[in-house]
């Protein structure tokens, strides 16, 4: 995390992750970790997700410094996003203690060069279902947690299918 410009107002955060999806099982015609260029396009592992954005942000730092910015630019880069967003958790923990936080964030995820107001996300929950044991002769006196877990999984799958059939918003 770094700030260019004043540190007494929120400013703009440029954020991205520095890792890439592993290449295992992918077929490349050349070394994916060696960048190649062709007709003003660059090819290589992570060129659009998200190393291109990070390279542009870092290459702009000298100009940002020279401009004597009145509104700060915050560079907030994380790691291990592709395997569970490990690095961003630590970044968030650090930023939570800041008295003055960025007012807006620009995340350099690939979006076909369109500005959007959101991007895919993830929510994880831990669910504990507790049953009630009983003798097999009196099963109506018990509660089978596995049956309720199966119903819950079925409900979640139906909701997922319903969401896939709905039109998406612009994010």
Language model segments and positions:
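Midchain, well-structured core segments that form catalytic/ion-binding scaffolds
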Residues: 89, 95-171
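Short, conserved glycine- and acidic-residue-centered signature motifs
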Residues: 43, 49-53, 142-145
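Acidic/histidine-rich catalytic neighborhood of metal-dependent amide-processing enzymes
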Residues: 50-124
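Glycine- and other small-residue-rich loops at beta-strand/loop junctions that grip anionic moieties
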Residues: 46, 80, 138
């Amino acid at each position: 995390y770094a700030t260019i410009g004043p540190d007494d107002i929120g400013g703009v955060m440029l954020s991205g992750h520095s890792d890439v999806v592993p290449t295992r099982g992918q077929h490349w015609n050349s070394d994916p970790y060696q960048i190649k260029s062709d007709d003003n396009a660059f090819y290589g592992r992570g060129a659009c997700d998200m190393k291109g954005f990070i390279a542009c942000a870092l290459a702009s730092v000298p100009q940002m410094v020279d401009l004597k910015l009145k509104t700060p630019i915050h560079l907030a880069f994380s790691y291990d996003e592709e395997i569970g967003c490990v690095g961003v958790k630590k970044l968030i923990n650090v930023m939570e203690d800041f008295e003055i936080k960025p007012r807006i964030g620009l995340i350099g995820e690939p979006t076909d060069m369109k500005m959007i107001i959101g991007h895919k996300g993830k929510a994880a929950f831990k669910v504990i279902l507790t049953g009630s044991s009983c003798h097999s002769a009196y099963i109506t006196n018990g509660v089978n947690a596995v049956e309720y877990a199966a119903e819950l999984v079925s409900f979640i799958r139906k909701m997922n299918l319903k969401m896939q059939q709905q039109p998406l918003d612009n994010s």
